[in-house]
Amino acid sequence: VGVDNTRASIGMNIKPGQTVMTGEGAEAVYVIGPDAFLQREKTKITFEDSAGAQAMRIVTGSVLSVFGKGREKARKLQLTTPTATIGIRGTGCYIEAEEARTYFCLCYGEAEAVPTGDPKQKETIRTTHHEHPIYILATGGKMMAPATVINHTDAELTMLENVVGRWPPFHGQGGSRY
């Protein structure tokens, strides 16, 4: 696991403009402010901050993320993949970014998914427990297609929320489905 060209270490701060990379067989859990991330193997993510908006560019790979809400005012958070731009608010989500498509599961919260190939096909999504996973495609007539829940669990979401002192909204509502 590396941050820019430096081997990552426990307690290392990640700042806007930096890139976090994981190699084969590596995973990383890290916290930036009220947000926590589980970055899977072979993933490259850059964090940016411009004009008061925070951005996370998933260049390639997979990441499970939980985002806290702003205290004083609404936070502007934007996720970018090769095929989509996703605006998020108080959200837990899982992304697998590839060149031709992005898998996006809004585990809970609210997001606006905008396909890069046709921004007019944007969709606002609201979920409480994995109800609307989608693929966002790079090309084609219909840019978003239904998907199923893959490669992430409620236990992982709970762990990430606990790392930042919270519980996921589905906590205490019966058994886990994922």
Identify the residue ranges that each predicted region occupies.
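Flexible, surface-exposed loop/linker segments and immediately adjacent secondary-structure boundaries
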Residues: V1-Y178
